[in-house]
Amino acid sequence: MILLVDAGNTNIVLGVYKDKKYIASWRISTEGNKTSDEYSIQIIQLLNLNNLNPEDVKGIIVSSVVPNIMHSLENMLRRCFGQEPIIVGPGIKTGINIKYDNPKEVGADRIVNAVAAFEIYKRPVIIIDFGTATTFCSVTENGDYLGGCICPGLRISADALFERAAKLPRVELEVPKKVICKNTVSSIQSGVLFGYIGQVEYIVKKMKEEMSDGIEPYVIATGGLANLIANETDAIDEVDSDLTLEGLKILYQKNRE
């Protein structure tokens, strides 16, 4: 049984992989001041609730974009499972060629997604990960990671408007029925959501132009808000909610020996 850990700025996603299939996954809040004891309690309870024995965990891999939780997280994993976790970072075997000016700058989450997309789809891909930040990454059919761009996430964009404009309320991230709205809440939703959709469509268009080699890139979306955006645009070909966990599984298999 393999434990997959994806630590993001907002949530930590945990997955369990056994007998060539996922048998459970959970999402817990990322908290920088949480101790290894607190993480231990959470993860053991989650395993027990799913009738999974912690002693059956034979391998662990971790991807993190939150440096200040890594000490607690690694200590917890070593203590709970008696395993040295594989950490996604410089020196790990990926099977892709990172064509970045400085490959060490590429976030672990982007590497994991790129590996998964390359191994699964076997064609040029654009990966959009809708997280705290939204990342766009391009990978060729030969496994060259070309780079991409990073944008403020959808929630960050909405929260910034609420925090900096005194008379505007915080709103739920819901797509309104029309662009032209007749109340403040719907007007904010229209501007934030449709504006973000337009941003996604334009960035995808420009990335496709720069990747043009005769094969149309396949656009994959993942992350917590992927379905919300994908339902409103033809720029996204597929939503793959398990892309990151799949990438972690692939990287574990490449690096377990």
From Swiss-Prot:
This entry's comment on the bound cofactor is: A monovalent cation. Ammonium or potassium.
Q: In which pathway does it act?
A: Cofactor biosynthesis; coenzyme A biosynthesis; CoA from (R)-pantothenate: step 1/5
Binding sites annotated in the UniProt record for K(+): 129
Query: Superkingdom of this entry's organism?
Result: Bacteria
Cell compartments where the protein resides: Cytoplasm
Q: Which GO terms describe its biological process?
A: coenzyme A biosynthetic process
Q: Which Gene3D superfamilies match?
A: 3.30.420.40
Q: What is its EC number?
A: 2.7.1.33
Top-level EC class, please? transferase
- Entry-linked CDD domains: ASKHA_NBD_PanK-III (cd24015)
Q: Where does substrate bind?
A: 100, 107-110, 184
Q: How does it assemble?
A: Homodimer.
- Please report the name of this protein according to its UniProt entry: Type III pantothenate kinase
